[in-house]
Curated annotation (Swiss-Prot):
Protein name per UniProt: SPbeta prophage-derived uncharacterized protein YoqN
Gene giving rise to this polypeptide: yoqN
């Protein structure tokens, strides 16, 4: 079953922009050809990731199973 929808061109541009943004690309332009094809010009956005600081000693101490102490 094929579902066809009539979308406005600016709505299509918005959908394409969100799709590529989710994949880490920046859309520069969207060109429409006469045969209905779209040419999307994108650029990979370099994500600046901060190195996560992990306190190894703290992590190690708190991952050990705790011994339960029972009062007699």
């Amino acid at each position: 079953m094929v579902i066809k929808r009539n979308l406005l061109s600016n709505h299509v541009d918005e959908i394409i922009g969100e799709y590529y943004a989710a994949k880490g690309y920046s859309v520069h332009s969207i060109d429409r050809q006469e045969n209905g094809q779209l040419i999307v010009v994108t650029e990979r956005v370099a994500e600046e990731k901060e190195n996560a600081k992990v306190d190894i000693a703290f992590d190690f101490v708190h991952r050990r199973p705790h011994k339960k102490k029972y009062l007699a």
